[in-house]
C-alpha cells in the first residue's frame, strides 16, 4: 500500500478519535503510537509523516533528485521498484505480521565503503523515514555476505521502529531477519560502532599473537 493510500486525512482523523480498527490497521503497516504518546499526538505525527512523504515525492518529480541529509542524494530513477521491496515485506510480514510498505527505498549512487550494504534514515523533525541500499542490488540478489531480501527486511524493521527510542534491543529485532543463525545470534550484540570493534579486534590480533608465539618457540628450541 502506498503512503498516499494509507495516510489519508480520513484515516488519520480516525486515529485521532481512537478508532481501534484504524489503530490495528496502522499497526500492521509498522505505524503505532510511541511510548507515552496518545491518539491525538500519534495522529499529529502521522500527519507530519504524510506531509514529508508527499513533499519528497513532489520534489523528486520536479527536480529529479533530493538531498535528505548531507552527502546523500536520492534520485527519482533510483527508487527501488515495488516488486523488489516486496521480497522484504514478505519476510517482515512472516516474522512480525508487519508490512511497512509505505517506506520509500532507493538504490544509493554514492559509495559508502566496500563493506557497506544499506541503512535506514530518519528525520525526527518531519518524521520522514526511508532506506537506501547498495546500487549493486539493482541487478543481483547477493553482494559479499549480504542478501538483498534480508538487508531490506533489516532496514524496514528499523523503519517500523522509528517511533521507539530504544537502542538496547533494536538490533536484536532487525537481525531476526537474517538467514544465518550466526548473524541472528550475534547481530543483536552490535549496538554501537565500538561493539563491532571489540568483537573484531581479537580476531585481527590473533595472527599477530600466533606469530609472536611462533618466534618465541623458535628461539627457545634454538
Where are these regions (language model features)?
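N-terminal pre-first-transmembrane soluble regions of secretory-pathway and organelle membrane proteins
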Residues: 1-87
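Active-site scaffold of zinc-dependent metalloenzymes
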Residues: 90-145
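Short, flexible helix-coil linker/hinge segments at the edges of structured domains or between repeats
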Residues: 120-124, 132, 150-151, 178, ...
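C-terminal or late-domain output modules
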Residues: 134-138, 149, 192-196
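Active-site recognition of the HExxH zinc-binding catalytic motif
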Residues: 146-163
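Post-HExxH zinc-binding segment in Zn-dependent metallohydrolases
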Residues: 164-206
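Alpha-helical transmembrane segments
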Residues: 205-214
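Pan-zinc metallopeptidase signature
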Residues: 217-222
Amino acid at each position: 500500500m502506498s503512503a498516499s493510500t494509507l495516510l489519508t486525512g480520513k484515516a488519520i482523523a480516525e486515529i485521532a478519535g481512537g478508532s481501534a480498527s484504524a489503530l490495528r490497521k496502522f499497526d500492521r503497516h509498522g505505524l503505532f503510537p510511541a511510548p507515552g504518546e496518545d491518539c491525538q499526538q500519534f495522529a499529529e505525527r502521522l500527519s507530519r509523516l504524510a506531509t514529508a512523504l508527499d513533499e519528497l515525492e513532489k520534489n523528486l518529480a520536479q527536480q529529479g533528485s533530493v538531498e535528505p541529509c548531507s552527502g546523500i542524494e536520492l534520485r527519482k530513477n533510483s527508487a527501488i521498484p515495488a516488486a523488489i521491496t516486496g521480497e522484504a515485506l514478505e519476510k517482515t510480514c512472516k516474522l512480525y505480521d508487519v508490512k511497512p510498505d509505505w517506506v520509500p527505498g532507493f538504490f544509493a549512487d554514492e559509495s559508502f565503503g566496500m563493506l557497506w550494504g544499506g541503512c535506514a534514515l530518519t528525520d525526527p523533525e518531519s518524521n520522514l523515514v526511508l532506506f537506501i541500499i547498495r546500487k549493486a542490488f539493482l541487478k543481483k540478489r547477493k553482494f559479499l555476505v549480504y542478501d538483498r531480501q534480508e538487508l531490506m527486511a533489516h532496514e524496514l524493521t528499523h523503519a517500523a521502529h522509528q517511533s521507539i527510542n530504544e537502542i538496547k534491543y533494536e538490533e536484536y529485532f532487525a537481525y531476526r531477519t537474517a538467514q544465518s543463525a550466526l548473524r541472528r545470534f550475534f547481530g543483536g550484540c552490535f549496538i554501537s560502532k565500538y561493539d563491532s570493534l571489540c568483537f573484531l579486534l581479537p580476531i585481527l590480533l590473533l595472527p599477530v599473537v600466533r606469530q609472536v608465539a611462533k618466534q618465541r618457540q623458535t628461539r627457545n628450541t634454538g
